Amino acid sequence: MNIMIALIPALLWGTVPLIITKFGGSTRQQTMGMTLGALTFAVIVFFFTDPVYTLKTVGISFITGCLWTVGQMFQLRAFKIIGVSKAMPISTGMQLVGTTLCGVILFHEWDTTLRIILGFIALALIVGGIFLTSYAEKEEDGTNALKQGLITLVISSLGYVGLVVLIQGFKIDGINAILPQAIGMVLSALIMTHSGGTEKRFNKRTLLLIIPGMIWAAGNVAMVHANQLVGVATGFSLSQLGVVISTIGGIVLLKEKKTQKEMLYVIVGVVLVVLGGILIGVAKGA
């Protein structure tokens, strides 16, 4: 039963990119809708929990919210450039490599020979998965789009990795972080989406996009609960399975076109990224 609960974050997070893309809208509208959804859910959670706020908790959580918006906005841009089925495994892989290396360098997580061995195998699998997933048939337009998408995902991953490092470094409790983090998301989204497009940021589509924002936030709360039930290492590993839902959903539901060879590379790449993510979780608990 605990494992089933721990799979909820992967299920929720895996469906979010599909819902966002299906709803459509500009990157600005999607960013505002997502952050407003996260804030709405955070306010609801606030009334049903008993968070403890300190200056450090509020300040760091607010900053992580800003970093999340950077990560999310650039990830949304990547969806439009190279598609969900290609962007998600690459993004997940980059985040796994980034957070793992920061954990090793800053927090000395690989403190045994077994963890070092498992960790390097995991990184090799993830890097291999990224390489395979990013494969594109030699078409000039596709190659240029891939380069642009990769640059966009690097910026996105820097935001996400920075968020994780700050939360871990300052030992911020998940429940305590939710509301100030969501406030940081919305305020930074307002600033980042102020210019850069002619379309309105706030319309009916923006309101519709609040739904995936709430789903993401629900996954975040579920992750906090899952970690308490099965431990951080197992919870982290299981959360990586969401990329499978996003990738397959992008191909099947969103009808993202791929050649037979690209399809094979994507499937194998996703498997490698997931295995690498699970192995990182094993290394954390070893």
Curated annotation (Swiss-Prot):
Organism annotation: Listeria innocua serovar 6a (strain ATCC BAA-680 / CLIP 11262)
GO MF annotations in UniProt: carbohydrate transmembrane transporter activity
Entry protein name: Putative sugar uptake protein lin0215
UniProtKB keywords: Cell membrane, Membrane, Sugar transport, Transmembrane, Transmembrane helix, Transport
TM region(s), chain numbering: 4-26, 33-55, 114-136, 149-167, 177-194, 207-226, 230-252, 264-283
Membrane topology: Multi-pass membrane protein
Subcellular location: Cell membrane
Coiled-coil stretches noted in the UniProt entry, renumbered to this chain: none
GO CC annotations, alphabetized: plasma membrane
Family from the record: Belongs to the GRP transporter (TC 2.A.7.5) family.
InterPro entries given in the database record: Sugar_transport
Pfam families: Sugar_transport
PANTHER family on file: TRANSMEMBRANE PROTEIN 144
CDD domains xrefs: glucose_uptake_GlcU
